[in-house]
């Protein structure tokens, strides 16, 4: 193949003549004149400081000089060549700017200090152009990022934000010192006091509501929520009428529900006090027409904007709001309503998508420094109550859990019940699955009651159980799915391993061993000797050594009925009524007086690092577990038994710390306590247990034999498998890459759930993020085997920041979606549910959340026939 030059005659093949390496826009002479004028005249400083910031100067030396001048001027000290040189020297910057002689150079170059303000305008223009160049460079980078797979909508939005920041001259820092914030805050407090308690915000038009909230403040997100037909859109328009018609401040409504004509008709009905039904039907009287014409002329100049574009996305709302902020000094945004918004993206659930809208609206409020009112629809919770009053929990989309549900903490490694979190008010770090299906620590920022609802018990093939309402989402391969939509045979996520807690605390090994022995095979009842029943002499020796930590000794009593050793003080007798050190130690751990079916693992063990967790499990297994090889079936048997379900769950949780997933079986017993067994299945997990945990005492020999047998070919049940639907994704990707080789094209293979090794092999051949996460993530895909209603119970939920999920009872569950709102107003109208209600004509604004003040219920009059709410007579 030949390479030829196909340029036309006369065309030069040299690079373009434009110099792409030229300096950014700047005017050093103007910068020097500005600084020279400021050094000569205090009046010049006053003219310049409102126009320039240190970052507007191109030369870093000029930035330092300008900053020093402003600092001296702010302290009331003179700012001349001598004092500025001293200030720069104190900061260690004098040599960097060229020494004291350079300050005199600045003074000598200024034509006249009287024109310093004009010179500052030149510097500001050049700074604006530089920022435009910088923004353009970043936009180009965003464009290339979009070509390489970044989300296009996000790229466009970031590009718009860059240009908006340039036009708005907002070069904000990521952090601001407290001293720079104190005076503006004092000014705001003074303004509030001088205006009779009303902040410089947007008045809602409702006297009592404004008294509580001090108006709608810049940067706030306000949610107005109600059931359909109660009047939430009307209230949003009332806020806009107060803002734009009464106070002549610009407002905009992005309406996804009503058309422009419907909105204008409602506004005219409210302002002219004409029945909306008469306007719609054309039955207006002459007086109505007169009032309408008069009011139209009065409100026609109101800076009120309406956008009824269908299928509005968050990106479009941001772009339009930014333009209005520049064009009309926008003061209020209303979005009607939240659940009708679309994103154009694929989210794991609608709940997460709505939560993202909420978060972006809050960010928009902060960016534009205006209040954003988001209209939202409540779930059916109010209709199920006798008084029909809405609660904050009705605003959330997720389901609820019972008080006994245990949440896995990331700070201590232990579990804590929802009910306990409600009582204590604690908000701990919890383990959560991120988008890569990896366990990460995230804060649980809220825990709250959700009333009394029907609860279902969901049981998995592994024996794990959780009690939740039908609306609570569980994680399937396809995404988060409410319990009511799950069916037997579905696969949902549970953690296959859990990291060490954030705050690990080592225990003395002697205490750890004694604790494991006492939990596994000990007795510590009140008014009885503390006993331990060893399986063999090696285990008795371990207890004898470890008991010394609490000044105790394992002593075999001589009388026949004793049969087992007692743990008691080794040296002295205690006065009557005093606990032994061993009993006091067990009581401090919450184990003293616990019977076998009440035992559990203390929090101190969960706090221990993983090597100590393995040591604890080794001695616990020696006391109450079994490890053996089954030659008949050609597989290993590893299990632990107890009459305490809580203890079994705790052991299962500890096994996750060493990367082992276990299975729980139930053995009912008539006339006694049921028993439970925890099994470790599969050669891979059994080998891991034997190598990283092991057993102590006589069973150690059996464990070595079992490990030897597991090195050969053994029966291995395919328990650790991925959902069968993953094959569709694998096949599509392999087919697209023409990689359907013999290893992954066996006809029978596609009919069954793949073991984790197969997606792992596929992931090595195809570049698919979902397959990668499935093959390497921390999610175990357990199978639903039973869903049973257990009646109505009081339920609770929580909110986890960022990832929006947590581990409860060993299962990954979605959380409630915390609203990002600063203010939540729940609208309640008694006669909406009962026309004969004695409070007919009244409505309640329930201020359910108020980040900067108290909550309260404000009663107003509803005049929905006039499309408005009104203040009640006081």
UniProtKB/Swiss-Prot annotation:
InterPro entries: AAA+_ATPase, DNA_heli_DnaB-like_N_sf, DNA_helicase_DnaB, DNA_helicase_DnaB-like_C, DNA_helicase_DnaB-like_N, DNA_helicase_N/primase_C, Hint_dom_C, Hint_dom_N. It catalyses: Couples ATP hydrolysis with the unwinding of duplex DNA at the replication fork by translocating in the 5'-3' direction. This creates two antiparallel DNA single strands (ssDNA). The leading ssDNA polymer is the template for DNA polymerase III holoenzyme which synthesizes a continuous strand; ATP + H2O = ADP + phosphate + H(+). GO terms for biological process: DNA replication, synthesis of primer; intein-mediated protein splicing; intron homing. It comes from Mycobacterium bovis (strain ATCC BAA-935 / AF2122/97). The lineage of its organism: Bacteria, Bacillati, Actinomycetota, Actinomycetes, Mycobacteriales. Belongs to the helicase family. DnaB subfamily. The main replicative DNA helicase, it participates in initiation and elongation during chromosome replication. Travels ahead of the DNA replisome, separating dsDNA into templates for DNA synthesis. A processive ATP-dependent 5'-3' DNA helicase it has DNA-dependent ATPase activity. The gene is dnaB. PROSITE patterns: INTEIN_C_TER (PS50818), INTEIN_ENDONUCLEASE (PS50819), INTEIN_N_TER (PS50817), SF4_HELICASE (PS51199). Residues 1-25 are annotated as: Disordered. CDD domains: DnaB_C, Hint. This is Replicative DNA helicase DnaB. Pfam families: DnaB (PF00772), DnaB_C (PF03796), Intein_splicing (PF14890), LAGLIDADG_3 (PF14528). Residues 195-462, 612-874 form the SF4 helicase domain. Its EC number is 5.6.2.3, 3.1.-.-. Homohexamer. The keyword Mitochondrion does not apply. This protein undergoes a protein self splicing that involves a post-translational excision of the intervening region (intein) followed by peptide ligation. One of its GO terms (cellular component) is primosome complex. Residues 582-660 form the DOD-type homing endonuclease domain. ATP binds at residues 226-233. Keywords: ATP-binding, Autocatalytic cleavage, DNA replication, DNA-binding, Endonuclease, Helicase, Hydrolase, Intron homing, Isomerase, Nuclease, Nucleotide-binding, Primosome, Protein splicing, Repeat.
């Amino acid at each position: 193949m030949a390479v030829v030059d196909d340029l036309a005659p006369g065309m030069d093949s040299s690079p373009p003549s434009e110099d792409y390496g030229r300096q950014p826009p700047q005017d050093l002479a103007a910068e020097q004149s500005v600084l020279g004028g400021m050094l000569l005249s205090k009046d010049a400083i006053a003219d310049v400081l409102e126009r320039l910031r240190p970052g507007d100067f191109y030369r870093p030396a000029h930035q330092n000089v300008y900053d020093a001048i402003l600092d001296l001027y702010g302290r009331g000290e003179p700012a001349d060549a001598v004092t500025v040189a001293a200030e720069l020297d104190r900061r260690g910057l004098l040599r960097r700017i060229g020494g004291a002689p350079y300050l005199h150079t600045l003074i000598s170059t200024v034509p006249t200090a009287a024109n310093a303000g004009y010179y500052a305008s030149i510097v500001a223009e050049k700074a604006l152009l530089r920022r435009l160049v910088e923004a353009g460079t970043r936009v180009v980078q965003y464009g290339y990022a979009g070509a390489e797979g970044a989300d296009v909508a996000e790229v466009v939005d970031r590009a718009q934000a860059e240009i908006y920041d340039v036009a708005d001259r907002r070069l904000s820092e990521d952090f601001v010192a407290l001293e720079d914030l104190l005076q503006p805050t004092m000014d705001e407090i003074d303004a509030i006091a001088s205006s009779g308690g009303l902040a410089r915000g947007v008045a809602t038009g409702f006297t009592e509501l404004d008294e509580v909230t001090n108006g709608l403040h810049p940067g706030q997100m306000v949610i107005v929520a109600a059931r359909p037909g109660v009047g939430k859109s009307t209230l949003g328009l009332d806020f806009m009428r107060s803002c734009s018609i009464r106070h002549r401040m610009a407002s905009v409504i992005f309406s996804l529900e009503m058309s422009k004509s419907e909105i204008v008709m409602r506004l005219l009905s409210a302002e002219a006090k004409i029945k909306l039904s008469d306007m719609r039907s054309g039955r207006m009287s002459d007086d109505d027409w007169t009032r309408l014409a008069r009011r139209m002329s009065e409100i026609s100049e109101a800076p009120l904007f309406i956008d009824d574009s269908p299928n509005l996305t968050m990106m479009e709302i941001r772009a339009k709001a930014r333009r209005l902020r520049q064009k009309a000094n926008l003061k209020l945004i209303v979005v009607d309503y939240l659940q009708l918004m679309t994103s154009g993206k694929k989210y794991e659930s609608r709940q997460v998508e709505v939560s993202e809208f909420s978060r972006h609206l809050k960010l928009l409020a902060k960016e534009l420094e205006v209040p954003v009112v988001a209209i939202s629809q409540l779930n059916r919770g109010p209709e199920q109550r006798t008084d029909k009053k809405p609660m904050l929990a009705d605003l959330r989309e997720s389901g609820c859990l019972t008080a006994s549900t245990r949440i896995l903490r990331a700070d201590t490694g232990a579990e804590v019940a929802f009910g306990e979190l409600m009582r204590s008010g604690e908000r701990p770090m919890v383990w959560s699955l991120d988008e890569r299906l990896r366990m990460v620590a995230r804060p649980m920022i809220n825990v709250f009651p959700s009333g009394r609802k029907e609860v279902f018990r969901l049981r998995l093939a592994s024996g794990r159980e959780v009690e939740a309402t039908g609306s609570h989402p569980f994680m399937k391969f396809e995404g988060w799915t409410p319990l009511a939509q799950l069916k037997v045979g579905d696969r949902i996520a549970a953690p296959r391993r859990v990291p060490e807690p954030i705050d690990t605390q080592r225990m003395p090994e002697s205490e750890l061993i004694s604790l494991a022995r006492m939990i596994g095979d000990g007795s510590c009842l009140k008014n009885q000797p503390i006993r331990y029943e060893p399986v063999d002499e090696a285990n008795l020796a371990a207890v004898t050594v470890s008991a010394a930590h609490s000044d105790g000794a394992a002593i075999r009593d001589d009388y026949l009925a004793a049969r087992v050793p007692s743990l008691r003080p080794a040296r002295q007798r205690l006065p009557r009524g005093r606990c032994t050190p061993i009993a006091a130690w067990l009581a401090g751990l919450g184990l003293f007086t616990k019977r076998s079916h009440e035992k559990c693992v203390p929090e101190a063990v969960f706090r221990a690092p993983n090597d100590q967790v393995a040591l604890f499990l080794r001695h616990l297994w020696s006391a109450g577990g079994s490890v053996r090889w089954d030659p008949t079936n050609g597989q290993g048997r590893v299990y632990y038994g107890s009459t305490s379900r809580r203890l079994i769950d705790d052991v299962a949780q500890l096994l996750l710390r060493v990367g082992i997933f276990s299975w729980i079986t139930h053995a009912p017993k008539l006339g006694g306590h049921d028993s439970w067994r925890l099994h470790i299945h599969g050669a891979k997990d059994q080998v891991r247990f034997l190598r990283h945990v092991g057993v102590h005492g006589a069973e150690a020999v059996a464990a070595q034999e079992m490990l030897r047998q597991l090195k050969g070919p053994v029966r291995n049940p395919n328990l650790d498998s991925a959902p069968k639907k993953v094959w569709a994704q694998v096949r599509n990707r392999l087919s697209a890459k023409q990689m359907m080789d013999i290893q992954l094209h066996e006809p029978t293979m596609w009919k069954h759930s793949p073991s984790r090794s197969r997606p792992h092999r596929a992931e090595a051949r195809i570049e698919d993020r979902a397959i990668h996460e499935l093959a390497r993530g921390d999610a175990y895909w357990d199978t639903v085997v039973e869903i049973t209603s257990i009646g109505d119970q009081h339920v609770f939920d929580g909110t986890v920041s960022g990832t929006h999920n947590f581990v409860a009872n060993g299962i990954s569950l979605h959380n409630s979606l915390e609203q990002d709102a600063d203010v939540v107003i729940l609208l309640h109208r008694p006669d909406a549910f009962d026309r004969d209600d004695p409070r007919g004509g009244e409505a309640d604004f329930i201020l359910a959340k108020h980040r900067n003040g108290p909550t309260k219920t404000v009663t107003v009059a509803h005049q929905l026939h006039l499309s408005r709410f009104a203040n009640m007579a006081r």
